[in-house]
Amino acid sequence: MKAGALHCRCAKCFSLPVRKRVRKRASAVSLLSLPEELLVFVLQCLSAEDLLSVRAVHSHLCDIIDTNASIWARVSFKDRWPAPDTVWLFERAAEKGNFEAAVKLGIAYLYNEGPLLSEEGRADLCGRMASRYLSLSESLRSPQAEPFIWLFIRPPWSVSGSCCKAVVFDRLQAECQTSPGRKGTLLYCLARVLQLFDDEEKRDEAELMLKESSRCGSLQSSYLLWAISRASSTADPGRYLQCMRTLRDYAARGCWEAQLAFVKSCGSANPLGLEPRACSELVSQFFQTGPSALRYQPHLQGQDITTKRYILVDWLVEVTTTKDFSSQVLHVTISCVDRYLHLRSVPKAQLQLLGIACMVICTRFISKEILTIREAVWLTDNTYQYEDLVHMMGEVISVLDGKIRTPTVLDYGEVLLSLLPVERRTAHLFSYICELSLLCSPATVPGPARLASAILLLTRALHNYVPVWPVQLEENTGFSKQDLVSCALTLYIKCFGQDVPKDYRHVSLTGVKQRFEDDSYQQISKDTVMGFKELCHVLEVPEVEPQVEVSSTSGQITEMHTFLSSPTSSSKRRRADSMQAHRGAFVATPTAELSNQEETLLGDFLDWSLDTSCSGYEGDRESEGEKDGEISTMEVQMELPLDCADRQTHCCLLSSDDTSLCEEDEQEPPTGGSKPWTRHLSSSSTSSSSSSCGFCTDRHSSGYSSIQSFPSPTGSSALVSPQNPPGVPSQRIRRQVKRKNTAAHSAGEAEQEDDAANLAFLSF
């Protein structure tokens, strides 16, 4: 083709150059390319197992993990417990400042529920290791935080053989001489232990320890000394004035118990001679700076968890009534449960384990009479093993950062009733509504300060007090009547205007109502409550139709049965068949934790012995009341053996065994998305043993069972019910069926926020 000549655009004489695709080079940015500060932040969010896996990926990651103590201090040990092959990991994290690892190691060594130790010197070795890590865990907390490790070594102690509690006590006492920085906290813990003994000499020694601890800067010890000397200073006006000034100083320094005592004194009188307006501002500030309402994890929200929580609280109320614990123990227990669920998700099938573990902890922290671990397991119909409860106690303490006691509705209620006293029957109604409010989900009620004020407003309205919300209450709380009316009406609807939830047997859960039918509360729950329209008229608000929530239980009946039904003895993990059967030679102290009450009532039905029972110590086996012979009356009911022709049908109808569930799944396809939960509490082997099962019926009990069934060589079952109050014979045949012992994997954990800010207090 000549230059400049035209040509056609056919494919033969004209073609476009082929465009080549230029492949972009892959970016070389990876995890290793991130700045070290960002890498450290990412690694801090991993679990212990994931951290070890990442450590083995690259030498750079290995160096970062090994050289940064902050990573080990924040690594998570969620649902993990020290074992012989992982104890080194817990120890390394604890030495780097990991509170969770230190707490779990201390509890594991104390109860010998972790590393297997040699038989020689078992009590001394367990005690030394437990004291080391319990002391370490206490040192990792804020100096202003109230110490907690004393509740694990509090009496009763073992009266025969070596006691691990006594070893820990002696080791902590020796550490006071070698560690001056921890002396104040450790002396406070030792003094709290000695105060619980009946010996007068030990109580005098405890007071000397408190004085030494106060000189070392312990604010809690100073407040306890003030409480001891308060009674002797009331007679002299000058000494009483100085006493109240000292209390004001402790309150200004952040001691919450001192703040509560000071506010109550300001409400009932004016001990410092302040202006009335100044006293009102102090009390108002106490209410306005109270803790806010809690919210559960997104995984644990909805009608399902609300109903299950209602059943749990109702069952805990029954346990509190049966064991004659105070209402404060119940409120603090529910507070621990809600705060745990606020910070960490838990399988719904483990709610009962969480609840009873919180009650075991709170009784040791608040009450003189404790709920022993052995008895707590028995109250759950042996659905959980001894070690399961010990592990959950470690989880609760670590998640709550050792902060057990927080302000409750009862605390603010005491202040309100001191501001404006009411009649005794009105005070009982106030307490009744306070416990009914525990049944409400935390997402539907405000914080304890506003909630207590709303309950008092509702109480005064129901008993026709005029004015229903005086100016004195408004000035001292900072809440006007308009601020509280909405909450008061909501409480009325939830407590009195709705049908109470029912379990899968369609039995109403009325544990709180039965509790306040007692004569000690003047049978306040039997009173007729005024109607909603009349209440609106008393509160001077427009009459509106109450929005009553109707819970649809038809779609939850199958899942509710799985949640409540108790496993039969063929699927229940038996202690004698587990790997713990031969541990009698390795426990630190005697293993029996059975109270005298249980021994007297059960007799030969109990098939456990010192050789086959789980770990623990005899010093944890009975409360002070049981040692004094205060034995509650329980009824043992025998059920006649069934005929062979009817036995199979009877067991198929009443059993919640895994085999029965599998047979139902083969016959009917799964519907409604309800799936049986799988258990992952521990790695203990599950044993199966065949025995007959018998059940009793109680139309007024909670959905949880407090029944323990024991195998009988004759084929019948001996059922023991702790639900009857002492001295009251049973009127009905009891049937208490508990949920199945299964669990689902947790859906995740929200990062724990630091809520250690003290309440602000005015200083004069």
UniProtKB/Swiss-Prot annotation:
SUPFAM superfamilies: Cyclin-like (SSF47954), F-box domain (SSF81383). SMART domains: CYCLIN, Cyclin_C, FBOX. Residues 702-722 have a biased composition (Polar residues). It comes from the Eukaryota. A motif (D box 1) lies at residues 309-312. Residues 732-742 have a biased composition (Basic residues). Residues 583-738 are annotated as: PEST. Pfam families: Cyclin_C, Cyclin_N, F-box-like. CDD domains: CYCLIN_CCNF_rpt1, CYCLIN_CCNF_rpt2, F-box_FBXO1. It is found in: Nucleus; Cytoplasm, Perinuclear region; Cytoplasm, Cytoskeleton, Microtubule organizing center, Centrosome, Centriole. Expressed in the brain. GO terms for molecular function: cyclin-dependent protein serine/threonine kinase regulator activity. Residues 307-404 form the Cyclin N-terminal domain. InterPro entries: Cyclin, Cyclin-like_dom, Cyclin-like_sf, Cyclin_C-dom, Cyclin_N, Cyclins_cyclin-box, F-box-like_dom_sf, F-box_dom. Its main location: nucleus. One of its GO terms (cellular component) is nucleus. The nuclear localization signals mediate the localization to the nucleus. Substrate recognition component of a SCF (SKP1-CUL1-F-box protein) E3 ubiquitin-protein ligase complex which mediates the ubiquitination and subsequent proteasomal degradation of target proteins. The SCF(CCNF) E3 ubiquitin-protein ligase complex is an integral component of the ubiquitin proteasome system (UPS) and links proteasome degradation to the cell cycle. Mediates the substrate recognition and the proteasomal degradation of various target proteins during G2 phase involved in the regulation of cell cycle progression and in the maintenance of genome stability. This is Cyclin-F. It comes from Danio rerio (Zebrafish). The lineage of its organism: Eukaryota, Metazoa, Chordata, Craniata, Vertebrata.
